[in-house]
């Protein structure tokens, strides 16, 4: 097999090489892989084409977790390479997390040759059906002549909006048949912008009596946007909060500190019970993680007025800039978190002592992978004043993400 693959490079470009070259040309330069027989031509192309770094994962869930962490931090997609339907299935848990985080990823999933599928070999599966619940874009590339264009479309889809998962299915004969082109990158559709009418309505709500909360996620949790939100808070007295689990949250010393809506339902209800106006920035109305007997699913009071400032697919940074201009807050100073760190504790190892150690020893620009759901909430106060860092949470609630998320 190896000698055959190596000798194939003496022949005209095949579909696999066409796809890899297209990915590189479109800015995808890392591929996290767990391949099998059907993907060997793609593996050979990864080795042959300059500009693509190949990272092997020994389990598909690790592969998809690494792609999630990479996309969250690099703000651009990587590629995965997975082995048919079962391989994709093994990676679904962390693709679920990645979808909730709005992480850009291009999944390349190998398949049997198109003419072999009808024989229902052991690994034959409905790959498109498996991919759809975690993908915003799914396509099977039926011909080596089409694979370059399909690859460019997949990258465009992954880069669209706040970030999406695009799954491109690569039949073995599409990979090994002769190809004739490398596709140019496709323009990504611009994100929609907040309207002037919405800006006016949000500004008015912020100036009214009663407690107002701006609740956010996504790109609103980056340092520059938080700085503007801090100025809005300084002028209007509003509260700022984020979802319980966010794809990437820049926090720590020197940054604007905001609340996180807590996981335990009773605590979350207490946090929100006094809110009169809720402004949603990339989020939906806060809801409970699970349903509980005699407790509400929606966490805000019935009397709370809800304003949709921008949904997650919109340009959140622009929305905040426009609101800051409308309120004329640029001469106001945001309240930034002072540097402080907890003292190290001795004695028995507890969640509190671990949190103290993390807050005390965390280096500057650390990346924290938080896959906790229960005990981990106690880490927030102990790390709030630590060195500036990025907090990557378990956005989809599917545990097992932590190590792969930061192994990038």
Model-derived segments and their meaning:
Residues 16-29, 34-37, 42-49, 335-405:
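Active-site diphosphate/adenylate-binding microenvironment
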Residues 5-333, 361-364:
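N-terminal alpha/beta PP-like core and its mobile active-site loop of ThDP/TPP-dependent enzymes
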């Amino acid at each position: 097999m190896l000698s055959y693959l190596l000798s194939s490079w003496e022949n005209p470009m095949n579909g696999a090489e066409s796809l890899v070259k297209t990915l590189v040309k479109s800015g995808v330069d890392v591929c996290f892989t767990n391949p099998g027989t059907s993907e060997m031509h793609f593996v050979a192309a990864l080795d042959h084409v300059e500009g693509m770094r190949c990272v092997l994962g020994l389990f598909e869930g690790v592969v998809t977790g690494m792609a999630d962490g990479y996309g969250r931090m690099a703000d651009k997609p990587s590629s995965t390479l997975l082995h048919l339907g079962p391989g994709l299935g093994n990676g679904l848990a962390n693709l679920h997390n990645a979808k909730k985080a709005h992480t850009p990823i291009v999944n390349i999933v190998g398949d049997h040759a198109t003419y072999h599928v009808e024989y229902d070999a052991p690994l034959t599966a409905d790959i498109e059906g498996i991919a759809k619940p975690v993908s915003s874009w799914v396509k099977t590339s039926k011909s080596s002549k089409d694979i370059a264009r399909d690859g460019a479309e997949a990258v465009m889809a992954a880069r669209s909006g706040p970030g999406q998962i695009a799954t491109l299915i690569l039949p073995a004969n599409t990979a090994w048949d002769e190809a004739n082109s490398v596709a140019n990158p496709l323009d990504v559709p611009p994100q929609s912008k907040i309207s002037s009418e919405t800006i006016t309505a949000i500004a008015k709500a912020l100036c009214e009596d009663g407690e107002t909360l701006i609740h956010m996620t996504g790109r609103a949790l980056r340092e520059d946007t938080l700085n503007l939100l801090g100025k809005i808070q300084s002028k209007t007295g509003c509260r700022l909060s984020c979802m319980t689990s966010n794809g990437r949250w820049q926090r720590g010393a020197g940054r604007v500190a905001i609340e996180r809506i807590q996981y335990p339902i009773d605590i979350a209800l207490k946090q929100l019970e006094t809110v009169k106006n809720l402004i949603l920035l990339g989020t939906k109305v806060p809801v409970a993680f699970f349903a509980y007997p005699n407790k509400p699913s929606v966490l805000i009071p019935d009397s709370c007025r809800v304003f949709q400032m921008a949904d997650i697919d919109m340009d959140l940074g622009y929305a905040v800039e426009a609101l800051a201009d409308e309120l004329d807050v640029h001469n106001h100073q945001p309240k930034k978190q002072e540097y402080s760190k907890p003292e190290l504790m001795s004695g028995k190892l507890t969640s509190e002592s671990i949190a103290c150690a993390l807050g005390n020893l965390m280096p500057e620009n650390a990346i924290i992978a938080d896959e906790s759901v229960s005990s981990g909430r106690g880490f927030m106060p102990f790390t709030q004043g630590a060195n500036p860092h990025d907090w990557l949470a378990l956005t989809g609630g599917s545990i097992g993400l932590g190590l792969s998320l930061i192994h990038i």
